[in-house]
Amino acid sequence: MRGWLAVRLAGLDVTEVVVAPSPEGRVLSDPTVSPSGLVPYLEHRGARVWDSLAIVEYCAELAPALWPADRVARAQARAIAAEMHSGLRGLRLAMPMNLGGAFAGRGRTPEALADIARVEAVWADTRARYGAGGPYLFGAAFGAADAMYAPVVARFLTWAPEISAASRAYVDAVRAHPLVDAWYRAALAEPEAWRIARFEVAA
């Protein structure tokens, strides 16, 4: 989701290849599809880029407006994007991504709740310092940091943890973005056979 959003935000001319997950939930069974054997993976004008954050940075080289123009704001954006990319393990494990699921009240492990509190603190701090003028983390433009947090937004929508009104407003703004909506529509149109049983039942 994150890499795809960055590619579309940057306006790159690419052909999408959708890889079906295995029944165990692994997204790739053919390591020749990408150097890491994982998705997302981008080939563009001779560049081969894997890992979602690397794809975001590559896209930002071609479309610098994906990051804030101000140096200090840009540092904040990169820091919070990297924190999301490398952390939030408790949230990921307890509340896996399932765009068609509805598991309100489930998955609230202590680790997940701690991660949710941290996400809310990051959002509140970033919006207070840089979010004037629009509904996104850095104001009016949906940028790289918002793309990186889109999977967190998806989890909040599926698992419905208790969050503040300000966080809910941000969640709603991200969900309403045309590219995020396009991702949801594509996901919900995937074949029934692609559903992974262990992600269809809440713990």
Where are these regions (language model features)?
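GST-like domain detector, emphasizing the conserved glutathione-binding G-site
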Residues: 1-110, 114, 122
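Residue-level detector of family-conserved "landmark" positions at structurally sensitive sites
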Residues: 17, 52, 166, 184-185
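Short, solvent-exposed turn/loop segments enriched in Gly/Ser/Thr/Pro and often Arg
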Residues: 20, 144, 187
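Short, hydrophobic secondary-structure boundary micro-motifs
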Residues: 66-69, 91-94, 135-138, 181-185
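A short structural micro-motif
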Residues: 84, 177, 190-194
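GST-like fold's C-terminal all-alpha helical module
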Residues: 88-176
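Acidic/histidine-enriched, glycine/proline-rich intrinsically disordered or flexible terminal extensions
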Residues: 187-203
